Structures are given as C-alpha cells and as structure tokens.
C-alpha cells in the first residue's frame, strides 16, 4: 500500500472541497450511501474539521434501494450530525414507478435523473459534489473535476473547460451549475485501501455473506423484499455474495465471493479484471448508455 500516493489523493480532494466551499454560494454533496460516498463524507469532514460540514448532504431515494443502505444512511446522519436532505420524485411515486413495471431505463430516468434535477432546482444548489471516478467508465474518463452543466443540468462534453494543474473555473450564470468530482483521480483500489487505512464505515453489503439471490440473465440479483417477482423457472438460492457497487437492488448484480474483510476485498481488487460497473444493469441499456444519461442530467 503506497501511503504517499493515498495522502496525495487525499490532499487533492480536500483542496477541491475547500475551493468549492469558498467559491460557490450554495453547494451540496450527493450522498448515494456507497463506498465512494463514504470516502467523500470522510474527506469532507477532514476538510472542515473541527467544524461541521458547511453544506447539506442530499440523497435521491428511488424507493428501491437496499434496506441496509437506508438504515446505514440514517445511522451515519445520526452519528456524524450532518444535515441530510432526502428527495423522492413525487410524480414517480404516484405512478408506482419501478424497474419491474416500467423497465430499468424509464425507472432510472424518472426516479434518479429527474428526481436529482428536481432536488437541485428546489434548493437552488449551484454546485454539487459527486463520487464519480475516471476509472469507472469511459464517459467518466473524459470528465473534468469541475463539470459544467447548463440551466437544464445537461452535460455537453464539448463545452467543458480546460483545467490546468489545480486551477478550476467555477464561473456560472444564473441557472447554470457545476458538478464537482473530488475523487476523479482515485481508482477503485485506492478507495478500498483508503477505507482500510482510515477505518471508514461502509454498508455491510460490500462484505461477503450468505444472501438470497436469483440468477437472471447471467446476473445474480439479491431478493431484498417481497416486491421482487420470482419466475416459475427461477430459484432463490442462498449464496456467499457481496457487491462491488450499490444502487437499486433489482438493478445491481452481486458477485460470488468469500471476502468478508477489507484485506480480502483489497486482495480481490488486485486480481480482478472486470469493471465494478459490470454489476449495474442500467449501464447496459444501450450503447453509450452512461454518456446519454449524463447528457440528460444524470450524475
């Protein structure tokens, strides 16, 4: 484990947090409750210690998150005493929106993308921190640290600004905003090593244990509640699995694993040859799926 490398990444991220807090009028941090959000929260607390985090955390709740994620979210808000905003798209809730009834693409657009834009508009945020990393996915590989969004929250890769060294351009007109990615230069392995080094709390779903899963289209989907339909030709099996990425439970694939400690997870990361986002069903909706979602306002 290269401590100098991790400390350099930490210092860069803390600098970005402080820059945004000083430069923008009304920032917010998107809190998805996953491992990257856990690191973001830890870095934000470090950046402004011994004071409190000077901006709220926003969780866009799709109504289909893992139960353990919601319990963990609420416990973290209680333990660390940060301001937590939770937003659900009311139109989506009224429609009974869900991945089984409306499909993954429509569900994600309504409950995540539209829900996020509603929340950003409601509170008038001009900057929003997110945990995206350039190593995750090809459209994120070309993302800036300061990602400019127009008045409709849309991302245009051709209109992004040059970033020289650690100089960031945060100028926005009324209605425009910046999405900020302090973890841009981190890798998945960096995240796990930092979590281990700093003893950062994470959702237990990242650790392997016996869980009820159904194999569907080659993906292991955990049966998290009774809303999940089980086909006549499907069988719920108890398997030792964990998650590399977390989202809506019907759209998140588990991986078979026995790694139930952080050193074991790090060892898996050193050997794996697949992207963590292979477990995200929404990334496979169509070619260039993530880039299209970002252009529509997705994070």
From Swiss-Prot:
Keyword terms, alphabetized: ATP-binding, Nucleotide-binding, Nucleotidyltransferase, Transferase
Protein EC: 2.7.7.4
One Pfam family, please name it: PAPS_reduct
Q: What InterPro entries has UniProt attached to this entry?
A: PAPS_reduct_dom, Rossmann-like_a/b/a_fold, SO4_adenylTrfase_ssu, Sulfate_adenylyltrnsfr_sub2
Record's SUPFAM superfamilies?
Adenine nucleotide alpha hydrolases-like
Origin superkingdom: Bacteria
Enzymatic reactions? sulfate + ATP + H(+) = adenosine 5'-phosphosulfate + diphosphate
Q: Which GO terms describe its molecular function?
A: ATP binding; sulfate adenylyltransferase (ATP) activity
Pathway the protein acts in: Sulfur metabolism; hydrogen sulfide biosynthesis; sulfite from sulfate: step 1/3
Some GO term, biological process aspect, for this entry: which one? sulfate assimilation
The UniProt family comment states:
Belongs to the PAPS reductase family. CysD subfamily.
What is this protein's function per UniProt? Answer: With CysN forms the ATP sulfurylase (ATPS) that catalyzes the adenylation of sulfate producing adenosine 5'-phosphosulfate (APS) and diphosphate, the first enzymatic step in sulfur assimilation pathway. APS synthesis involves the formation of a high-energy phosphoric-sulfuric acid anhydride bond driven by GTP hydrolysis by CysN coupled to ATP hydrolysis by CysD.
* Description of how the protein assembles with itself and partners: Heterodimer composed of CysD, the smaller subunit, and CysN.
Give the protein's recorded name. Sulfate adenylyltransferase subunit 2
- The species is Colwellia psychrerythraea (strain 34H / ATCC BAA-681)
